[in-house]
From Swiss-Prot:
It comes from Brucella canis (strain ATCC 23365 / NCTC 10854 / RM-666). PANTHER family: NADH DEHYDROGENASE SUBUNIT 4L-RELATED, NADH-UBIQUINONE OXIDOREDUCTASE SUBUNIT ND4L. This is NADH-quinone oxidoreductase subunit K. Its EC number is 7.1.1.-. NDH-1 is composed of 14 different subunits. Subunits NuoA, H, J, K, L, M, N constitute the membrane sector of the complex. The gene is nuoK.
Length: 102
């Protein structure tokens, strides 16, 4: 049995749906929102790699590496901002972050 593109797209759709539901169902915890965004980016990368291997082109795989790099930087910067915010405010709830408007 061969794993076709439909299998990859199904897994990618499930990951994307989990990420979107994670954002909409849990709006109070910033860390869960960041993890949900990472799930969405992972599903996009899986689509890039699946279509790239299906079409025999390496552009999708190279673009997936760029997206992974940007996602890692986004996660590192987001977590660093959350650590500083937690040290200053004592909480990382989304309601407290919205108060920080400058």
């Amino acid at each position: 049995m061969e794993i076709g593109i439909a299998h990859y797209l199904t897994v990618s759709a499930i990951l994307f749906t989990l990420g979107v539901f994670g954002i909409f169902l849990n709006r109070k915890n910033v860390i869960v929102i960041l993890m949900s965004i990472e799930l969405i980016l992972l599903s996009v990368n899986l689509n890039f790699v699946a279509f790239s291997s299906q079409l025999g082109d390496l552009v999708g795989q190279v673009f997936a590496l760029f997206v992974l790099t940007v996602a890692a930087a986004e996660a590192a910067i987001g977590l660093a901002i959350l650590v500083v915010f937690f040290r200053n405010r004592g909480s990382i709830a989304v309601e407290d972050v919205n108060v920080m408007k400058g």
